[in-house]
Amino acid sequence: SGSCEVKTCWWSQPDFRVIGDYLKDKYDSASEMVVEKHRESRGWVETLRPKYNFFKAPTERDLVYYENSPNFCEPNPETGSFGTRDRICNVTSHGIDGCDLLCCGRGHNTRTEKRKEKCHCIF
C-alpha cells in the first residue's frame, strides 16, 4: 500500500481589531474629491478629481469621498438624528463617549449624585 498526503490551504481573516484599525486609518486619511462632468463622444461622463491639488492623488487602495457627513451634533429630522445635546458623556474618556467629542465643543455640565442602593452583598 502507498501513502497519501493531503495538504489543504485556506485564507483566514486577520483579527477583527486589525481590520478595524486598518479601516480607521483609511477613514482618517480619506481624500476629498469633486465630481467633474465633461462631454465625450459617448455623452456626458463624470469623473472624480482631488478637491485640493496640493495633496497627492489617491491610489486605487485609498478611501475617497465627495460628500461631507451630516452634522450629527444638531438635530436633523431629515436624517433622523436627535443631535447630542443633553446626552450623558464621560469626562475622562477620549473615545466616542467622551465629553470633548460628544458635546461638539459646546461645553458640558458636571453633576454629582449620591445614591443609596442595596447591593445584595455577601460577606
Swiss-Prot record:
A lipid is attached at residue 1 (O-palmitoleoyl serine). One of its GO terms (molecular function) is frizzled binding. It comes from Sceloporus occidentalis (Western fence lizard). The keyword Kinase does not apply. This is Protein Wnt-3a. Keywords: Developmental protein, Disulfide bond, Extracellular matrix, Glycoprotein, Lipoprotein, Secreted, Wnt signaling pathway. Disulfide bonds join 89-104. Disulfide bonds have critical and distinct roles in secretion and activity. Loss of each conserved cysteine results in high molecular weight oxidized Wnt oligomers, which are formed through inter-Wnt disulfide bonding. GO terms for cellular component: extracellular space.
